[in-house]
Amino acid sequence: VFSASCNQKILACAHTSERNFSYLCRVMENFVVSARKYRPSTFASVVGQRHITSTLKNAIERGQLAHAYLFCGPRGVGKTTCARIFAKAINCLNPQNGEACNECESCRSFNEGRSLNVHELDAASNNSVDDIRNLIEQVRIIPQQGSYSVFVIDEVHMLSAAAFNAFLKTLEEPPKHAIFILATTEKHKIIPTILSRCQIY
């Protein structure tokens, strides 16, 4: 049998734990994983890929954008990061030397995760033909803001054979407003007909 003083101690501990839990929840709301917190947000802040970032910046400055890009390389070298920076810069309303301004509505909506013009698909977990068909449906929609709808497909080598074939038709005849940026660690797993339609970095 618990004594009254023991019950009071238990209640005090529970109250303290509740306050600590509340505090922890408030702290966690503002918590950002280091990889995201320190992920480069401009071409200038990308380390070790100057030859690629300068080429992409030149394409934006000159308005010479391809309809499909493939970024290849080992994990952690910045493929997806460069794809996101490029996607943002493509639709920036006031680009400066190929860099996104980070101030226009298009840049702000991208930075806040509410851009309607940039679509990301993680093919590691969304690799079926239905996932690609859903993406193809989005490709048909004209961009609401900016000139292009940009589709970033990460780990593209993970797509099923049927998904690759479904995607190929769109890649062969893309609408003028669509740009695809594919990223992979295993280029050799991508079918040659896809490779032949991409600028490869």
Regions from the PLM with identified roles:
Residues 1, 10-11, 27:
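Short hydrophobic transmembrane-like helices used for membrane targeting/insertion
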Residues 5-8, 12-15:
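Cationic, amphipathic, low-complexity segments that mediate targeting or membrane/lipid association
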